[in-house]
């Protein structure tokens, strides 16, 4: 009898991707976040599907429909809170996944890395349009402020903003199209994930040492399937704890108030996972400059492979670069904190310094450290 797993056209692909896939024997827990992101995406699509069955994308009923889901739908409150906190888990895993890629030099798989950056941008867009849907105060004003940034584009800016709004302000047309985008984008993300994995399996996984692991590979199943399963259980435990015990911990209290175009909230701020970029945006006292800095803060990831100056791939054996990496991490946490603070001193100057340091670390200091470490390791004979 032929082995179905190895000969069936579909099972063969699954087998080569998740069962008989040769994987490096030394990949650590930092490599778990790819599979965790896959689980996050599945959770978000399933909870989102059930929410979409009861949600209405109309300005008059959107807020009430969300309240109805929480009050009257069986376990509607749980589905909604899993979806809201699932987004936070998604971004937590995303940031760690990208950080792992930078630390261990995974960005040298350029195709995989570039698709990953596109995925990050798509997930950010999905989260933004999704945040508008409950039609609370922060939903409405967040949408108004962020879409308004496009008006900084010379010549076509104002026309572009009105085109996206579908009118002269954020209104019914905007909400309806944002719901349409929020529904379709996760499926586009799924397709991109397939491409991401396709490119990854062309090269095989990187590993903590950054050395070629071909001499020592082990099958993905059972070694990494069981390891991923442990990751799933831990993540679902954290997500369930969040959704059950403190579902509103990461949300904004202003979103419990229905959207009111006549009343601006005292502090307009996005969800926690956008605060670092929001802080960079606000640190430049010029609209166009701020928008460009905001874009640069994410798009800088694309040029990271070009900034790799070291002969070693990973930071595992490079203490100076390691220090700079953790300084960058601390800097991003500082930016996240600043993004949630009001625009007043000392927060303004801290945000500006942190923004300058962010770009300096990535563009100047880390490449220089790579060159310096190479020179320090070079044997010097008299």
Swiss-Prot record:
Where it mainly occurs, coarsely classed, is: mitochondrion
The record, for SUPFAM superfamilies, names: a domain/subunit of cytochrome bc1 complex (Ubiquinol-cytochrome c reductase), Transmembrane di-heme cytochromes
Q: Which residues bind a ubiquinone?
A: 201
Alphabetic keyword roster = Electron transport, Heme, Iron, Membrane, Metal-binding, Mitochondrion, Mitochondrion inner membrane, Respiratory chain, Transmembrane, Transmembrane helix, Transport, Ubiquinone
Example GO biological process term? mitochondrial electron transport, ubiquinol to cytochrome c
The molecular function terms of the Gene Ontology recorded here are: metal ion binding; ubiquinol-cytochrome-c reductase activity
Give a Gene Ontology cellular component term annotated to this protein.
respiratory chain complex III
- Extra information: Heme 1 (or BL or b562) is low-potential and absorbs at about 562 nm, and heme 2 (or BH or b566) is high-potential and absorbs at about 566 nm.
Q: What is the documented function of this protein? A: Component of the ubiquinol-cytochrome c reductase complex (complex III or cytochrome b-c1 complex) that is part of the mitochondrial respiratory chain. The b-c1 complex mediates electron transfer from ubiquinol to cytochrome c. Contributes to the generation of a proton gradient across the mitochondrial membrane that is then used for ATP synthesis.
Q: What family does the entry list? A: Belongs to the cytochrome b family.
Identify this protein by name.
Cytochrome b
